[in-house]
From Swiss-Prot:
Cystines in this chain: 6-11, 17-33, 37-48
Tissue specificity: Expressed by the venom gland.
Functional summary from the UniProt entry: Binds with low affinity and weakly inhibits muscle nicotinic acetylcholine receptor (nAChR).
Organism for this UniProt entry: Naja kaouthia (Monocled cobra)
Keyword Phosphoprotein appears in the UniProt entry: no
Any Gene Ontology CC annotation: extracellular region
InterPro entries, alphabetized: Snake_3FTx (IPR003571), Snake_toxin-like_sf (IPR045860), Snake_toxin_con_site (IPR018354), Toxin_cobra-type (IPR054131)
Family in the record: Belongs to the three-finger toxin family. Ancestral subfamily. Orphan group II sub-subfamily.
Main localisation: secreted
Assigned keywords, A-Z: Acetylcholine receptor inhibiting toxin, Disulfide bond, Ion channel impairing toxin, Neurotoxin, Postsynaptic neurotoxin, Secreted, Toxin
Protein's name according to its UniProt entry: Weak toxin NWT
Pfam families according to UniProt: Toxin_cobra-type
Length: 53
């Protein structure tokens, strides 16, 4: 299994997982604030600030 290992949306750093290695999956992209806060997608946590700036 090959995993991407950087927090950016477009990532080219990979790590080959060894047999039995625990897999951790977290996605974190800054996509907007307040009025532009995106709708949550399945299996995604979206945290937004309450006001701009």
């Amino acid at each position: 299994l090959t995993c991407l290992i950087c927090p950016e949306k477009y990532c080219n750093k990979v790590h080959t997982c060894l047999n039995g290695e625990k897999i951790y999956d977290q996605r974190k992209y800054i996509r907007g604030c307040a009025d532009t806060c995106p709708v949550r997608k399945p299996r995604e946590i979206v945290e937004c600030c309450s006001t701009d700036k």
